[in-house]
């Protein structure tokens, strides 16, 4: 009964994960899949609003506890699956041998180790010490000099962000991962990638073992024979589903590394791309207060040029002749991402030891 419940919850969570990750992609626009995703997000917002209300009533402690439900639930599900695999599937493998036993147990240990490392490692809390060796500077396009976090009241270095869940600012912020209840940033991105790779290894290798365990058995009899066949067949189906989702998500992060952006920065670059699409982003010479780019706006019927940093008016119609304005027509051709040093160098930077 417990195993059946876990399987059902696993299937539901995998479908929900797929909807959240890919339901808004252009391929699914104006389809039932996007509508399901929007409904899921709407329900999630209502639930989170209730959580925040109840959390306030309990002096901010409830949400901290609830944040651990997903990683604890993940570890519990994985542990039960491991137990079922060792009990039912492993005996079906003829003469597994020492090497195969080693790889099986190593894969299991790697799951626990990577989860612990990703969940409890420092993502990159901002201190005066680590700022001295922090390599990134503002590009004056999506990150600017002199920015201060309105919550922490500390200086915000380039590529950092405040996490509302952890209530802290982190260097090279990527995203807050619910599966580990931790932010992914400057110091622990390597453990996050290890977490993903260890899951891909578990799903791929585990699925392969389940397939070979079932090979001598007629597929028509899998669901109608003994419990071991049923468990192994279910594992094969689950591994086949989850490895696709996990692999796609991992390749998505590899694509971000290739582009030289983080998940957080992708949204910022999307805003820049939107301004370019509207034809209102300009490069200026000479720069004003170290700002090299401005946005054209209309004030009282006249064109003005405002700061991307704080939306102050930097250039009025009366003094526009003092500056050289060049319209940015393409993000790819006219703008340079100073944080992109090529895929291999980007990867080395992200997997910082």
UniProtKB/Swiss-Prot annotation:
Transmembrane segments: 2-22, 62-82, 101-121, 191-211, 234-254
Active-site residues, record numbering mapped to chain: 177 (s-palmitoyl cysteine intermediate)
Main location: endoplasmic reticulum
Cytoplasmic side stretches: 23-61, 122-190, 255-353
Signal peptide: none
Lumenal side: 1, 83-100, 212-233
Cysteine pairs bridged by disulfides in the record: none
GO BP: protein targeting to membrane
Compartment(s): Endoplasmic reticulum membrane
An annotated GO cellular component: endoplasmic reticulum
One MF term in the entry's GO annotations: protein-cysteine S-palmitoyltransferase activity
Topology within the bilayer: Multi-pass membrane protein
Domain DHHC: residue ranges: 147-197
EC identifiers of the protein: 2.3.1.225
Pfam families membership: DHHC
Reactions catalysed: L-cysteinyl-[protein] + hexadecanoyl-CoA = S-hexadecanoyl-L-cysteinyl-[protein] + CoA
Keywords of the record: Acyltransferase, Endoplasmic reticulum, Lipoprotein, Membrane, Palmitate, Transferase, Transmembrane, Transmembrane helix
Family assignment from sequence similarity: Belongs to the DHHC palmitoyltransferase family. SWF1 subfamily.
Its biological purpose: Palmitoyltransferase that targets several endosomal SNAREs. Palmitoylates the SNAREs at cysteine residues close to the cytoplasmic end of their transmembrane domain. May have a role in the cellular quality control of transmembrane domain-containing proteins.
Record remark on domains: The DHHC domain is required for palmitoyltransferase activity.
Name the UniProt record assigns to this protein: Palmitoyltransferase SWF1
Species lineage: Eukaryota, Fungi, Dikarya, Ascomycota, Saccharomycotina
